A protein has these predicted regions:
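Glycine-centered secondary-structure boundary/capping sites
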Residues: 19-21, 126, 130, 277, ...
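Generic preference for well-ordered secondary structure
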Residues: 19, 23, 48, 75, ...
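Long, low-complexity C-terminal extensions of enzymes
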Residues: 152-304
Length: 304
């Protein structure tokens, strides 16, 4: 019997034909539209950002990714809180003068996933399996995870059913946990200026599992006990980065008496900052590193 892997992006051809239902997450993640543009650098030596810049907007957010010759920029938004024309104006406003003539592409998507990804001799991988939104590159992570699990669970002896049950249970739990992580970026925001942000912070839009974790973290930081290393694609450090990067306050006053290493911690943080300043002053710029990689076959094929 032949095996099939459904990785088709737009039509998701196999799953609908097999009547595998799609579980929508629109009640949790409101964004369902995107507008993308490519913006060439004004100068060939213009700096390349070494990270993706994500900027919150009235009804969504904008991504800004620096590449070697251009920036990839897009606006992700909710059609329940904005419309295509308004969202495009927001994007062009972010682009500035260069955005007046920039070509843009509009996309529609729905946040969600399939609760059954392995059915008989077919497996859904990548966007045919599920998609939340461009935030945190969960699509790439899930494609890699799926490929690894298929390799480990491949039914060489014909044990399709047992392999499928394990694969589906694992993927379902991964999607549920990743959904919580993406929602975290919205639900702890301090913004209340638009309906989009007010709806996002309302408890009714937050999964019970995430509310439970937030209750824990009011009095202690996330730790390894909150994370399942066999399931979660984001570590406790990732949760901490988002929580405290967005200003979350963990009240440690009740255990102040046992926190005896405050001075040591301050010295350690000061040393980290010193090393960061040294690195900034002495390491090559991101553009220089990219140019070196292209000319010296650093991590890949040399430029032609």
């Amino acid at each position: 019997m032949a095996e099939r892997v459904d990785s088709l992006v737009r039509r998701r051809s196999l799953a609908p034909a097999m009547r595998i239902p799609f579980s929508s997450c629109r009640d949790v993640l409101f964004c369902n539209r995107a507008i993308a543009a490519q913006l060439p650098y004004a100068r060939p030596d213009e700096p390349i950002a070494s990270y993706t810049i994500s900027t919150a907007q009235e009804a969504g957010w904008i991504w800004d990714i620096g590449l070697d010759r251009r920036r990839g920029i897009g606006h992700v938004y909710s059609s329940d809180h904005s419309d295509d024309e308004a969202a495009e104006r927001v994007l062009r406003g972010y682009l500035g003068a260069a955005g007046e003539k920039a070509d843009v592409r509009h996309f529609k998507f729905e946040a969600g996933y399939r609760e059954v990804n392995w059915y008989k001799n077919c497996v859904a991988v990548g966007l045919s399996s599920g998609f939340f939104e461009p935030l945190e590159a969960t699509g790439i992570a899930f494609a890699e995870v799926s490929a690894g699990m298929i390799a480990n669970l491949f039914p060489w002896g014909g044990d399709y059913e047992t392999s499928a049950r394990q694969f589906n249970a694992n993927m379902l739990r991964r999607y549920e946990r990743a959904l919580d992580f993406i929602k975290l970026h919205y639900c702890i925001s301090e913004r209340r200026d638009t309906a989009f942000w007010r709806d996002n912070v309302a408890d009714a839009s937050v999964p019970d599992s995430l509310l439970e974790m937030l209750d824990r973290w009011r009095f202690r930081p996330p730790n390894e006990l909150d994370i399942d290393g066999q399931i979660d694609i984001f570590t406790e450090a990732s949760w901490q980065y988002v929580l405290y990067g967005m200003g979350w306050k963990t009240d440690l006053s009740a255990k102040a008496g046992v926190l005896r290493y405050g001075d040591d911690a301050r010295r350690a943080f000061a040393e980290v900052q010193r090393q960061a300043r040294y690195a900034i002053a002495n390491l090559p710029s991101n553009r220089d590193l990219v140019a070196y990689a292209q000319s010296h076959s650093f991590g890949g094929r040399a430029a032609a």
